[in-house]
Amino acid sequence: MAPATPATHDPALSHGAPPAPGAPAPANAPPNASGDIAGMQLSGLDQSQIMNLLRSLPGMFSGGKIPDQGQGNKEDAAQTLSNLAQAQPYGQQLPLHYQAGGPGGLPGINDPGPSTHPRGPPNLGQLSAVAMQAAPAPIQHPDQQTNRNDGEQAGNASASTSGKDGDNAEFVPPPAPAPTTGRRGGRSATMGSDEWSRQRKDNHKEVERRRRGNINEGINELGRIVPSGSGEKAKGAILSRAVQYIHHLKENEARNIEKWTLEKLLMDQAMGDLQAQLEEVKRLWEEERMARTRLEAELEVLRNMNGVNAGSAPASKDESAAGTKRRSTDGAEAATAATESSTANAEGERDGKRQRTE
């Protein structure tokens, strides 16, 4: 808080300066701006603090110089009001850290402070109201005058509210919406209006048209797939033939499954019988091979015996030729008889085995 210093009271500052006669009122100024600004009371500041605040405003007094404390007069006050009128409103120009008082900074507007004026502090709210009336009308962008829908109006209102709260950035109008057709265009219509009802009916008709088109395409495809003898084109006849054809296919599938199952069982049984017969043939062939091997061994023994008998015959040269021939004839006959008997036995066994196999 700045120390209380004596200052000369100026009646013009307490009662406010009259508006300039030649300055016309702005056409687009808000109707309640003067009343809102006039309601602001700076009862806790003296003249020195007010001058310090005016000096600290950025860009407010670029064209003139603020007189020092104690040297102000009516002309200086008028110059100050003129500079204030040419600048932006106080709420938009002053940064946020100048609007609210805090510890270690400038005092706030509503903070109480010492007053050295005998008749109270000057009414700066009236001076601000006069400055707002003398301010030029802001130039509006053409895009801001166009009608928006409910969502865009809400966005513009929030943007303007944030600008009034102290945002120094330049206002950028939202981009114009692209022209919409079809269902998106129907959303902009007010609910319950004739336009909304008409768009809703159009959308319903479009949905129904697509549904009927899909149904017709499906029925035509069935008519091409299902065989038809009479060539009927009616939708009901096509559907009836399709149902009958589906039942016929299901019956054929069931019969085919039953036939395939029976054939598989018969094939398995036949394979089992063939396998058993193959095993029996293998067993008989093995027995025949063993019998043949045995007969060949016996025949070899008999041949050896005949060779031994033939070598011992010329040992006695004194024997008569008749006796020698008789013995050799007897031995040959015995060998022949043995061979024939063994051959007959082998053939008998072979015939018996063949009969059993058949």
UniProtKB/Swiss-Prot annotation:
One Pfam family this sequence matches: HLH
Composition-biased stretches (Low complexity): 179-190, 331-346
Protein localization: Nucleus
SMART domains documented for this protein: HLH
Major localization listed first in the record, in broad terms: nucleus
Coiled coil regions, renumbered to chain: 264-306
Region (Helix-loop-helix motif): 213-249
Molecular functions per Gene Ontology: DNA binding; DNA-binding transcription factor activity; protein dimerization activity
Top-level taxon in the UniProt lineage: Eukaryota
Stated role: Transcription factor that may regulate the expression of the gene cluster that mediates the biosynthesis of psilocybin, a psychotropic tryptamine-derived natural product.
Protein name: Psilocybin cluster transcription regulator
Primary gene name: psiR
